[in-house]
Amino acid sequence: QSDFSPGAVYDEVVTELEVANVVGMITYQQELDLAALAETFDERDEITDVTYEPADNHWLQTRFAPDDTYVAFYRTGRCSIAGCRSIEHFEPMVGSVNAVMRELLDFEYEPAAEISNIVATSDLGSPIPLELLTLELGMDAVEYEPEQFPALMYRGTNHVILVFASGKLLCTGLTDLEAVSEAVANLGGRIQAVV
C-alpha cells in the first residue's frame, strides 16, 4: 500500500537544490606525455594519488588535495575534473591543476576550462505516484520500468531528471545552476498536476 495522498500539496515546488557533483574539462593546446606526468605527479604533495596503467586505460588518473578531487589527464591535452561539490569548488580546482601544469609544460596561454555537467538533487517533500506521472509526462519523454530501476527517468531537451517515488529528484546534463533550477522547477510544476 502506498503512503501517497491525492490531496498532498507542496508548499514549494523545489525546496532546495543541492549540488552533488560538478564535472568539467580543461584543454591544453598540446599533447601530454602521460608516463612523464605520472612520474612527476608521484613527487607532488598536492597530488594524493596517481594511477597510470596504459595497458588497461588510456588516461592518467589522479586525486588532488585537499579533498581528493578526481582529475584525469588524456594524451590529447584534455583534462577532466570530477567530484567538485560546487561551482565555487570547481574554479579553484582548475587553478590548482593549471598551477601544476604550468610548472611542467611550456605554455603562455590561459587553458580553456568549462563545466560540462552539474549533478544536483532536490526533495519535493512528498511521495510521487510515478505511474500517474508517467501518463502526465507522456511515454515519449519518460522511461519507467520499476522492476529494473526504482526511478522514473524524464528526458528534457538537454538534461535528464530521475524522479523517485519518495519525492527526491536528481538532475544531470546541464552546465549552469540557473538552468538546473529552472528544469527542476518546471518538472516540479508538472508533478503537482498529478498529486
Regions of interest found by a model, annotated:
Residues 1-80, 84-161, 166, 174-195:
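Intrinsically disordered, low-complexity polar/charged tails and linkers
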